[in-house]
């Protein structure tokens, strides 16, 4: 949807897509479910480096995503995909991201959501939208709470989009 809207506006905005393209990593300390699986059966207190492996859920290759964009006539130079775990790619790439109008977070888990907020939220323009796809999952909600506490700001009022998981706020 964002790529289509951007195309209709002459591709004036850069669209960044960060994804592991390996699936969702293993849940951690603040998560109460392993997304897509349910009960957590691994050591969620293990070091992050040991949990940055795919749980096997929601795996789409970068090539298939580019193919889908291309087939719909949406893939152009305004779109940049970054492959890898957020914890590994954001520290290296975030400086290249300029102001953000819409930040959509779909990290599913605490650590994925928190690292995205740490590196990308400061770049969200005043009046920009922040969408948290999985806000009702404990890990995502706690990540939002912890992030805003760390920057000494109140947690923004979250507005539910779909009557379920997806929530957003305006900066």
Write out the residue ranges for each language-model feature.
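S-adenosylmethionine/decaboxylated-SAM
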Residues: 1-171
């Amino acid at each position: 949807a964002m790529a289509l809207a951007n195309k209709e506006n002459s591709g004036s905005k850069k669209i960044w897509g960060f994804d592991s393209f390996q699936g969702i990593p293993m849940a951690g300390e603040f998560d109460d479910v392993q997304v897509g699986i349910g009960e957590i059966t691994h050591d969620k207190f293990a070091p992050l480096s040991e949990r940055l492996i795919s749980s096997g859920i929601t795996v789409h290759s970068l090539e298939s995503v580019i193919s889908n964009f291309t087939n719909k006539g949406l893939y152009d130079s305004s779109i940049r995909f970054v492959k890898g775990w957020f914890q590994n790619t954001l520290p290296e790439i975030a400086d290249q991201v300029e102001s953000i109008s819409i930040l959509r977070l779909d990290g599913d888990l605490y650590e994925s959501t928190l690292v995205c907020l740490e590196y990308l939220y400061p770049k969200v323009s005043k009046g920009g939208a922040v969408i948290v796809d999985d806000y009702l999952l404990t890990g995502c909600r706690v990540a939002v709470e912890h992030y805003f506490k760390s920057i000494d700001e109140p947690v923004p009022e979250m507005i539910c989009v779909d009557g379920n998981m997806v929530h957003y706020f305006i900066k």
